[in-house]
Design a protein with these regions (language model features):
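FNR/FR-type flavoprotein reductase catalytic core
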Residues: 83-263, 267-272
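C-terminal accessory/binding modules appended to enzymatic or scaffolding proteins
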Residues: 266-309
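Iron-sulfur (Fe-S) cluster-binding segments and ferredoxin-like electron-carrier domains
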Residues: 280, 293-297, 302, 312-359
C-alpha cells in the first residue's frame, strides 16, 4: 500500500537545542499498525504555510520498542517547514503525518553479537539514534559505535540522551563527538569529519573494517567523503548504508540515462498511475515531472522532498519509458528493476504507466 496521510495530534514538543525541536505524536489504536516503523525510517509532515501546501520528511528518532512516534526538526536557513515547526507547533495541535517510509534500515538480525558503526553529522543523528536504541534494547551481545560531528557542544542534538545511553550500556555503546568549532582535549576529535579526520578514527578508534554494518547520515559531502574513506580501508560496499539529508556539491546523482540518449522529454504525454490499487490517468505537460503533473491534476500521489533524496515518490515503470534526472536514494537493484523517483522523472514515450504499489 502506498504511504498516506492521517491527522495526528502532537503529544509533546521538546526543545533539544537552540535551533532544533523533537515532536512526538499520539497514534490512535485504529492506526497503530499503519504507523508501526522500522528504525531508520522517516515521516513526512504536511502543513499549510502562508497559503502553500508544504511537506517535508523527518527521520524517526525513537527506537522500535520505545512506544512513541517522534521526529526531530532542525531549523535551516530558508526552510519554511523547519521554521514553522520550531516556532509554531505546540502540544495539542493536529498535523498531517504520512505513514512511515524509507529503506535506511538495520540489516536483519540473525542472533549472536554484531558490531555496528554510524557516522552522523548535525541532524543526521535522528535515524541513527533510533537504530542505536533498537539494537541496544534488542541485541544484548551487539555493540554500536557512533562518530558524531557537530560545530559545538551546544549544537549537539540529543546530547543528554546519548550520554544516558553510554552510561546505561557501558562496553556496548561508544560515542565520539567530533567538534569543528571547539577545541577538545583529544586532538583527533577536533575539526571537521573530512578524510584526514575520518581515516585515523576509522582505523585506530573504531575498526570500521570489522563492522557488520556502517551507517552514514547527514550532509551529502560528509557521506561521500566517509564512503570513499571506508572503501579505501577495504570495507565491503554492501555493508555501507547511506541516507542523504542534502546532496553533495558536485556529487554524482546516480540516475540512469534513458535507453535512447537523444530521447525527447520536452513533449506532452499521458501517465497512468497505480496508487492503492486504483488507476488514474493524468496529462503531463512538456518538461513536467510525474509528481508535478499529479499535483496539477489534483491526484494525491506520494511525494515529499522533490529533490531525489527521500524516496517517498518511488514507483515502478510498468509501461513506457521515463528519464530520471537525479537519484540519491534508490539502490542499484531498484533502478535495474525499473523503479524511479517520480519527482525526478519525465516521460520519454507518449504514454507511461507507473505503479506506486510495487514493492
Amino acid at each position: 500500500m502506498s504511504p498516506r496521510f492521517h491527522a495526528l495530534k502532537v503529544r509533546e514538543v521538546k526543545r533539544e537545542t537552540a535551533d532544533a525541536v523533537s515532536i512526538s505524536f499520539e497514534v490512535p489504536e485504529s492506526l497503530r499498525e499503519s504507523y508501526r516503523f522500522s528504525a531508520g525510517q522517516y515521516l513526512t509532515l504536511r502543513a499549510t504555510i502562508d497559503g502553500a501546501d508544504v511537506r517535508r520528511s523527518y527521520s524517526i528518532c525513537a527506537g522500535e520498542d520505545d512506544g512513541e512516534l517522534r521526529v526531530a526538526v532542525k531549523k535551516v536557513e530558508g526552510g519554511a517547514f523547519s521554521a514553522y515547526a520550531n516556532e509554531n507547533i505546540r502540544a495539542g495541535d493536529e498535523i498531517d503525518v504520512m505513514t512511515p517510509s524509507g529503506r535506511f534500515l538495520l540489516p536483519a538480525y540473525e542472533g549472536g553479537g554484531r558490531m555496528l558503526v554510524a557516522i552522523a553529522a548535525g541532524s543526521g543523528i535522528t535515524p541513527v539514534l533510533g537504530m542505536i536504541r533498537t539494537v541496544l534494547a534488542r541485541e544484548p551481545e551487539s555493540e554500536f559505535f557512533l562518530l558524531y560531528g557537530n560545530k559545538t557542544a551546544q549544537s549537539i542534538i540529543f546530547k543528554e540522551e546519548i550520554e544516558d545511553l553510554k552510561d546505561l550500556f557501558p562496553g556496548r555503546f561508544g560515542i565520539f563527538h567530533v567538534l569543528s568549532r571547539e577545541t577538545q582535549d583529544v586532538e583527533m576529535l577536533s575539526g571537521r569529519l573530512d578524510a584526514d579526520k575520518l581515516t585515523p578514527l576509522l582505523t585506530h578508534v573504531v575498526p570500521a573494517v570489522e563492522a557488520d554494518g556502517v551507517f552514514l547520515c547527514g550532509p551529502g559531502e560528509m557521506i561521500e567523503t566517509a564512503g570513499a574513506v571506508l572503501a579505501g580501508l577495504g570495507v565491503d560496499p554492501a555493508r555501507i548504508h547511506r541516507e542523504f539529508f542534502t546532496p553533495a556539491d558536485g556529487s554524482p546523482a546516480h540516475a540512469p540515462k534513458p535507453a535512447h540518449a537523444d530521447a525527447d522529454i520536452d513533449h506532452a504525454a499521458s501517465a497512468e498511475l497505480v496508487i492503492d490499487g486504483a488507476r488514474v490517468s493524468v496529462p503531463v505537460a512538456a518538461g513536467e515531472t510525474i509528481v508535478d503533473a499529479a499535483i496539477r491534476a489534483g491526484v494525491e500521489a506520494p511525494f515529499s522532498c522533490k529533490g531525489g533524496m527521500c524516496c517517498t515518490c518511488r514507483a515502478k515503470v510498468v509501461t513506457g519509458e521515463v528519464d530520471m534526472a537525479v537519484n540519491y536514494s534508490l539502490e542499484p537493484w531498484e533502478v535495474e528493476a525499473g523503479f524511479v523517483l517520480t519527482c525526478q522523472s519525465r516521460p520519454v514515450t507518449d504514454k507511461v504507466v507507473l505503479d506506486y504499489d510495487a514493492m
